[in-house]
Structures are given as structure tokens and as C-alpha cells.
Amino acid sequence: MTDIPDPSTATLQFPGGTAEFPILRAVDGRDTVDIATFMRQTGLTTLDQGFVNTASTKSAITYIDGDQGILRYRGYPIEQVAKNSTYLEVAWLLIYGELPTAAELEDFDDRIRRHTLLHEDLKRFFDALPATAHPMSVLSSAISALSTYYEGELDVHDPEQVELAIIRLLAKLPVIVAYAHKKALGQAFLYPDNSLSFVDNFLRLNFGTMAEPYQIDPVLSKALDRLLILHEDHEQNASTSTVRLVGSTEANIFASISAGINALFGPLHGGANEAVLNMLAQIRDSGEGVRTFVEKVKNKESGIRLMGFGHRVYKSYDPRARLVKESADEVLESLGVEDPLLDIARELEQIALDDDYFVSRKLYPNVDFYTGVIYKAMGFPSRMFTPLFAIGRLPGWIAHWREANNDPATKIGRPQQLYVGPPERDWPTAR
């Protein structure tokens, strides 16, 4: 009689024997082989550069199916979330797991408003920085400095201290971003106006002046709120994984978030929307037209890259991209702006979607393709695009840090390596 393999285990044959590993069932998506005992059973390690095939953790926060173009926050489809919620409501959902009651959301909003002010000494921190400093460098430095004002309230094992730190981050990080913008412009910092909503307050801090009242544009507020929602989480990306890895050392949440900001600063992660805008401007300035540019991309001409298409996870149309495109149309129509870059983007998207070269390679527009056009129309310079991404991603970083911090199974991150250096050798006695 032939033995039937246990369907809940995976069997590995290797020189010297076999080993079995349990298969963990996912609620949705791919099941996972648990290799926690791999080294003990086999004497080997695994190599997976870029963690393409490796689940580093269990998480209940966000689900992505890249083949089907699905993104869900705590089970809710992103299309429903973006059209029916607000940034702060989604932040609560991600951090605490369920939608807040009306009373919980009101209290959450109120606590954040009451913590928007920065210590006056921290405001002077900006005086030591050059006006040319990149806002992301300013942001990561300021978040690290922010923790020094709460030295007695950083215990990662004290739930009350953790919750207060979460509120402070949500309240103060957007203010720091706005002040980095004002620093670059050489304009005076405004104090937050806590009578305004989260998004309206942020827009006023960026574009208001001491000389006159700031006029709220509800279309811009709605569009920015949606963009922030769409960026709130994307499961185990590079910056989120960085936050979790740093947090695994029991570093406080300020230090962990600062590390995530630095990871986001990398051009392969947070700088894609700025690169898209530069590409569109390059097409415009060349005078050669979109089709000529597309042919250059297909011919792999030196220095020509198609930005804003394709994604490490999505092998179909990024579900966030459709929602961003809607917002782009609404913002430019509201402002009465005719931006040739948006026209170029639309033409480029249509050509690419109809071209087998791009379709066969699963190169579809991603969330970054239209965001830069919107931010530019709002008045943000391109160097502010990644800090805006950081504001959006902050609740996701917090949610993952908190999930890992509350999980008794969390271990300090310490990957193995495949050593490929010199073998043992003797130190020369005479040189």
C-alpha cells in the first residue's frame, strides 16, 4: 500500500534525508510553508533575495492579490474604503482592527487635534537646516528628535504610553512635513488651526500665510484625503518591513517610524511619482510625441524608461490607480487647470494598454502614475511628493508596529546569510 502524503505538510528531500514542514492556511491568498524548524531539521538555510517568496510574519491588517488587482484593508475592498471613508477613520481601522463608532472616531479626532502643536524648541530645530534640505531628510531627523521630548513615555510595554505616542505621531508628523515645505519656501510657520479637519489643517499649514485667511477648497480636500487613504497601507513593503524589523528590537515607535521614513526615501520605493512627473515633462519638452517615446521604450533606448507602469506585487491594473485617475480629473477641473502633462499621461496610458508589448509584460499603470500630476496641480513641489506618501503610510506603519509589538510570537529580526567570502586563511607573519 502506497503512503499518501499529508496534505497539510510539505516534504523536502535533501542530501542526507527528508524533512516535513507544516503548511499554514491563509484566510485569502497563498498558503505558507512554515520553515521555522528548517535549519534544525536539515542543517541548511534558505536563500531568497528580496524576500520574493518569503512571508516574514503573520498579519491581519492588509490583503493583496496582485494577480487579480485586489487590495483590502482589514477585509474591506479599497474601492469601498476610498469612496466612503476618511483618512482618520481608515487610520483607526488599520490600527485597531475594526471601524470606530461615531463616538470613538470623534474622540480620536479630538485627541489628534489637541496634540498638533510642536514644542517651540523643536520648531527652532528647522533653523539649523539649510533651505535646500530635502523634506524627507528633515522629516526623518525631526521624528527622531521628537522622541526626545517624551523620554519618560516611550515604554513599548506600557499600552497607555504606546497609545499616546500613536496620537502624537498622527498629530505632529503632518505639521513637520508642512514646516519642511515652508522652510524651503522661506515662509513663516503657521500654528495649526484645530477648528479645521485633519486634511484642511494640513493644506492651510502648507499654503496659508500670515497675511490673509486661507480659503478651503473642498475638491482639493476630498482629493488629498483620498490619496492619503490609498497610501495608508500596502502590507509588507520595504518601509513597513523596516518598521517591523526595527520594532522587533523593542525600539520605541518614534525610532521605528523614522527608520521607515528613511526606507521610503529610497527612489525605488517612495520616489516613483516624482519620476513619473519628470518622464511626462521629458516627453513634453522633447516635442516628439507620446508614440515616439513609447517606441523608444520598446526599443530599450539608453536613458529611456517607462515610469509609473508595473509593480512588484500587481500583475494587473493597480486598483488604486483607477481611483487616483478619477481624482486627477476632478482636481484639474475644479482648479480650471489645463495641464498638458495630464493629457500626455492619458495618451500614454491608452497607448500602453492597447499595446501587446506592455500587456504581455503585465505593465499596467500603478498608483504613482497620476499622483504627481495631482500634487503638482495642488501646488506641491515635486520634492514634497514622498513626504506626502509618508503621511499617507503613517497609519499603516503604526498598525504593523503595534501588531508586532503586541504579538508574543515576535522575535528580534536576525536573518541568516550565505557566506561567499574567502575561506579560513592565516594572517601573514611578515609584510
Where are these regions (language model features)?
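Non-transmembrane, aqueous-exposed alpha-helical and coiled segments at domain scale
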Residues: 2-431
